[in-house]
C-alpha cells in the first residue's frame, strides 16, 4: 500500500463528494470540480472521510493510489478554501496591469504582451508589480502561473523577469574588468 494513498482525506463541512460512472465530483463553497477516476482505484466515502482503495494490489497501482489521493485532496481543498500563487515582476520598465480577464505585461520586448486568463482563474495586480492568481483548480492555477513566468523567466545576473514570490534566484557575478 502507498504511504500517501492510505491516508484518509477529511471532508470539511459544506463540501459534498460524489462518485459516479468513473468520475469524482467535489462541490463546495467556492465551486464545483470534476475529474475522471483511474479505473484501477476506487473511492470509499465513509462519514466525513474519503479513502482511496486499489482494486488489485500491484506495485504500479500503488503509485496510482497515491496520485489519485493527492488529486482528490487538492480538489477538496480547492472547493473549500481555494489556492493562491503570487508572481513578482522585477526589472526597470517591467510592469503588469489587469484589464478584465486579460493580463497586460510590459516585459522589455518591442511590444506589450497580452495574456488571457483561463476561466476559473482570477488575478490581482498591486502597485509593487505583484501578480496574485487565485482559483479552485490547483493544476490549472499552477499551469497558468508557469505560463506567465515563462514569458520572461528571471535571469541570473540582475534578476530581471517574472518569478514566483517564494522563488530564490541564484545570482552570478558579472564580467570582471581587467
Curated annotation (Swiss-Prot):
The keyword Lipid biosynthesis does not apply. GO terms for biological process: cytoplasmic translation. The keyword Ribonucleoprotein applies. PANTHER family: 60S/50S RIBOSOMAL PROTEIN L6/L9 (PTHR11655), LARGE RIBOSOMAL SUBUNIT PROTEIN UL6M (PTHR11655:SF14). It comes from Desulfatibacillum aliphaticivorans. This is Large ribosomal subunit protein uL6. Part of the 50S ribosomal subunit. GO terms for cellular component: cytosolic large ribosomal subunit.
